[in-house]
From Swiss-Prot:
Additional information: NOTCH2NLA, NOTCH2NLB and NOTCH2NLC paralogs arose between 4 and 3 million years ago, after the separation of hominids from the chimpanzee and during the early stages of the expansion of the human cortex.
Assembly behavior: Interacts with NOTCH2. Interacts with DLL1; the interaction is direct.
PROSITE patterns: ASX_HYDROXYL (PS00010), EGF_1 (PS00022), EGF_2 (PS01186), EGF_3 (PS50026), EGF_CA (PS01187)
CDD domains membership: EGF_CA (cd00054)
GO terms assigned for molecular function: calcium ion binding
Function in brief: Human-specific protein that promotes neural progenitor proliferation and evolutionary expansion of the brain neocortex by regulating the Notch signaling pathway. Able to promote neural progenitor self-renewal, possibly by down-regulating neuronal differentiation genes, thereby delaying the differentiation of neuronal progenitors and leading to an overall final increase in neuronal production. Acts by enhancing the Notch signaling pathway via two different mechanisms that probably work in parallel to reach the same effect.
UniProt entry tagged with the keyword DNA damage: no
GO biological process terms on file: cerebral cortex development; Notch signaling pathway; positive regulation of Notch signaling pathway
GO cellular component: extracellular region
Disease: Neuronal intranuclear inclusion disease: An autosomal dominant, slowly progressive, neurodegenerative disease characterized by eosinophilic hyaline intranuclear inclusions in the central and peripheral nervous system, and also in the visceral organs. Clinical manifestations are variable and include pyramidal and extrapyramidal symptoms, cerebellar ataxia, cognitive decline and dementia, peripheral neuropathy, and autonomic dysfunction. Defects in NOTCH2NLC may be a cause of chromosome 1q21.1 deletion/duplication syndrome. Deletions of NOTCH2NL (NOTCH2NLA, NOTCH2NLB and/or NOTCH2NLC) are present in patients affected by microcephaly, whereas macrocephaly is observed in patients with NOTCH2NL duplications.
Organism phylogeny: Eukaryota, Metazoa, Chordata, Craniata, Vertebrata
Name of the molecule in the record: Notch homolog 2 N-terminal-like protein C
Keyword annotations: Calcium, Disulfide bond, EGF-like domain, Glycoprotein, Neurodegeneration, Notch signaling pathway, Repeat, Secreted
Keyword Disulfide bond attached: yes
């Protein structure tokens, strides 16, 4: 029993290694490992029972003992193992598809005046003629006459013509920075102002935000109304009704006890759990932990 590297084995079967005279010797092998197995010399193509053609390729033998695989239409490669990449010619503008049979890949040989992977662009395209992208920018052809520049770090603009003034992050408080003609411009979030959006707007300077006698409290980028008793809402614009909506949690029922007061009637299980927590806290307070303090 012989074994070839890569799992090949058996006389005449598929195996590791390639049909090369410099194939490496393998342990437990009677000679060298070839594509067809282990033998003292390489098998002859389309002879010695070695017919490697796939995809209905036909083995053809020459008088000198060599052979090759004759591939059906749509396949190529040494063993017809690749689909013909030129079967559907992608080359445009009179370009010629050139297949690389061994790799199963193809390239386009473009007609004069055209370029691109598929010969889709004219050499009169601005990317070639005027080289519009400045400061090391890369020109990408979008169509026959349009392009887009990818700029190097530190530059911006349609043609990378401006120094990116936003690179130093000058805009504060979550504002958006844009560069126009080498200058930055900050678009501030609501509640902030200034060239760099560094100044908080004091909304409380403008009267009327809080209704029914509510007090305005300025906050960074916003404000809050502190309502008088009997009123609620963002602007103190709603009458306060203690149980609408109910403030009670865990299934408790709200009962209004006065104009501005209420009480929660809790479910028995909730009361029991609350009592257990209270008893545990009391034991901790009266026990060892309290004595150590």
């Amino acid at each position: 029993m012989w074994i070839c590297p890569g799992g090949g084995g058996g006389g005449g079967g598929g195996g590791g290694g390639g049909d090369r005279e410099d194939a490496r010797p393998a342990p437990l092998c009677c000679g060298r490992c070839w594509r067809s197995g282990c033998a003292a010399r390489p098998p002859r193509m389309c002879r010695d029972g070695y017919e490697p053609c796939v995809n209905e390729g036909m083995c053809v033998t020459y008088h000198n003992g060599t052979g090759y695989c004759k591939c059906p239409e749509g396949f190529l490669g040494e063993y017809c193992q690749h689909r013909d990449p030129c079967e559907k010619n992608r080359c445009q503008n009179g370009g010629t598809c050139v297949a690389q049979a061994m790799l199963g890949k193809a390239t386009c040989r473009c007609a004069s005046g055209f370029t691109g992977e598929d010969c889709q662009y004219s050499t009169s395209h601005p990317c070639f003629v005027s080289r519009p992208c400045l400061n090391g920018g890369t020109c990408h052809m979008l169509s026959r006459d349009t392009y887009e520049c990818t700029c190097q770090v530190g530059f911006t603009g349609k043609e990378c013509q401006w120094t990116d003034a936003c690179l130093s992050h000058p805009c504060a408080n979550g504002s958006t920075c844009t560069t126009v003609a080498n200058q930055f411009s900050c678009k501030c979030l609501t509640g902030f102002t200034g060239q760099k959006c560094e100044t908080d707007v004091n909304e409380c300077d403008i009267p009327g935000h809080c209704q029914h006698g509510g007090t305005c409290l300025n906050l960074p980028g916003s404000y809050q109304c502190q309502c008088l008793q009997g009123f609620t809402g963002q602007y103190c614009d709603s009458l306060y009704v203690p149980c609408a909506p109910s403030p009670c949690v865990n299934g408790g029922t709200c009962r209004q006890t006065g104009d501005f007061t209420f009480e929660c009637n809790c479910l028995p299980e909730t009361v029991r759990r609350g009592t257990e927590l209270w008893e545990r806290d009391r034991e901790v307070w009266n026990g060892k932990e309290h004595d150590e303090n």
